[in-house]
């Protein structure tokens, strides 16, 4: 008996991994391969937690110099400066703010959820910002991770009829790089329906297709 897509377990379609949007078979092919973390990723997590604490407490990251984050990472002046760059940017933005907001995009892709670093509502614009602590330059234009977070942030708002535009922002302190991209809300939702949903359905199929590409 041929296996149907109903027999396929729900894979977690991660916003940070765009391979499933480009190559539906990549998720099932990687099933069973353990996730590996790196020191850079763990430091990034520690810096995100430091920034979140400072934003919620209204204090400078310098106040945590000498402390440890995640019981492992010493907060040095250099690491404080990285967090401060992002904290200062967020603090200077007008609007209603939420930090490290859990978002779900499961109405577009089963199991697709994540955490948006900062979500800011101001007039008719919804800003979704992402702190990147690495040295590889990342741009906001057509950034699928941020676009998915944008869909999730909209889901978090009971009535988003007042929102006209989604502003997606990448903040990279170590590169002194801030990049932003604007997309109309209706265009983003259309992308969710016309790109994300079909890609998720193909990923969940019993025999998903493979479309290997450098971007995936």
Named regions from a protein language model:
Residues 94-207:
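Mg2+/Mn2+-dependent nuclease catalytic core
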Residues 1-126:
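Metal-dependent nuclease catalytic cores that hydrolyze phosphodiester bonds in DNA/RNA
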Residues 1, 52, 56, 190, ...:
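Accessory terminal regions of nucleic-acid processing enzymes
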Residues 14, 38, 75-76, 139-143, ...:
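Alpha-helix initiation/capping motif
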């Amino acid at each position: 008996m041929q296996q149907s897509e109903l027999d396929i377990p729900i894979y977690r379609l991660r916003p940070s991994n765009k391979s499933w949007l480009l190559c539906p078979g990549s998720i099932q092919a990687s099933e069973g391969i353990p996730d590996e973390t790196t020191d850079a990723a763990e430091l990034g997590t520690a810096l995100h937690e430091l920034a979140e604490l400072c934003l919620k407490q209204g204090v400078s990251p310098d106040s945590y110099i000498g402390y440890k984050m995640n019981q492992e990472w010493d907060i040095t002046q250099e690491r404080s400066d990285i967090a401060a760059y992002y904290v200062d940017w967020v603090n200077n933005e007008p609007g209603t703010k939420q930090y490290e907001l859990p978002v779900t995009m499961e109405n577009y892709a089963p199991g697709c959820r994540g955490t948006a670093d900062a979500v800011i509502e101001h007039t008719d614009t919804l800003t979704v910002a992402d702190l990147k602590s690495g040295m590889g330059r990342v741009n906001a234009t057509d950034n699928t991770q941020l676009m998915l977070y944008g869909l999730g942030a909209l889901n978090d708002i009971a009535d988003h009829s007042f929102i006209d535009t989604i502003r997606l922002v990448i903040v990279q302190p170590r590169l002194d790089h801030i990049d932003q991209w604007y997309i109309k809300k209706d265009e983003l939702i259309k992308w969710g329906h016309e790109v994300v949903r079909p890609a998720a359905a193909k990923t969940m199929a019993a025999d998903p297709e493979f479309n290997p590409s450098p971007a995936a």
